[in-house]
């Protein structure tokens, strides 16, 4: 009897060590299913922590967060993030000019400690606060994110002409130099045909060219980053010229969420890693399938950043994943969408499916399901980032997380990857001699 138990214990230790999964099971959680056969599914050579470069932790900060959400740059866990994507700048469809969308939030608002009597021309708002975080945390970098779902219809026209692409790149880089960004993130959702996919490649090429020129103006060695938010749905990523795009990109932020929602007829998982062969309706998309496509087009593992939602999508009047539903109900800021910090809802049973790496909470009396990532599932996703050397994690968006020490998903992911010492080490830039703002240009660095 003792020998049998010893074999079981040793076997369990070997399996868990191989998987590098770290998780804790709360009282509200159901027992995990096992899906270890998935671990051999990638036809790639596993790397170690992003190819030896460390992991990237990337969070979107939205410029409207300072209003009803009461979330400011000062709330960001800057010592635990390598990159923040400041969202969103827009594009003028007639010219390609990139411009800020909320001057009050972006550059004008005076936060506590900001003087009204500073001499010269100075930037304030979220931009100044983020720059101060850069000064205190030299591994913390800020990228200007352009586009997003609301503004993406403005890309196609300027991207289709040489002049439009040049204007886009020039004005984006000008904002970078004026405001002290470390790079540009482009979120075009989505090119609709091969012509637009080709235009996208040429747009990235032009932005990369002008970023390279901006780098040469610096006394110290610096590399300005170029990244994209990329789709996880086959109907969108199959249109992209992935291999051609990849040569200009530092990394890809995979939007591994919104796999199911109010637009569907069936309640499903919104951020599952694997598809469910026994319940196809519940998993119309999967992170696994998307990653295989990008890797199959030559993208290195360590350039793929795995998106993690800091929110849940609700379905009313349903029996659960794979069943019909009737409406989505209320939400934190929009119907059917709940901030992670508001989850799980009361009287909901939390379900973790380790076979799919998917989780949800369900209220059987009300027939309400909310698909969201629990700390247990995020820890398992971090385990796969470790196992296969993916580049790190990305979160939409920072205001919705729980505080560190209270089941924060950002903290959970980082801890499961090995902690802060596993972060990629790449210094930010503090040298912007061409900035029109005195408090950016005249910084002693």
Residue ranges and their predicted role:
Residues 3-19:
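Cleavable N-terminal signal peptides of Sec/SRP-targeted secreted and luminal proteins
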Residues 21-176, 408-411, 415-444:
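Glycan-recognition patch characteristic of GH18 chitinases/ENGases
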Residues 53-55, 80-82, 138-142, 180-182, ...:
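Short, well-ordered coil/turn segments that N-cap beta-strands
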Residues 58-59, 95-121, 189-345:
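Substrate-binding surface in catalytic domains of secreted glycosidases
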Residues 63-78, 160-178, 234-245, 287-291, ...:
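Short, acidic/polar
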Residues 84, 144, 186, 207, ...:
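Conserved, mostly hydrophobic/aromatic
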Residues 147, 184-189:
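Mobile, glycine-rich extracellular loop/lid and propeptide segments
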Residues 331-390:
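Hydrophobic, secondary-structure "cap" segments at the distal end of domains
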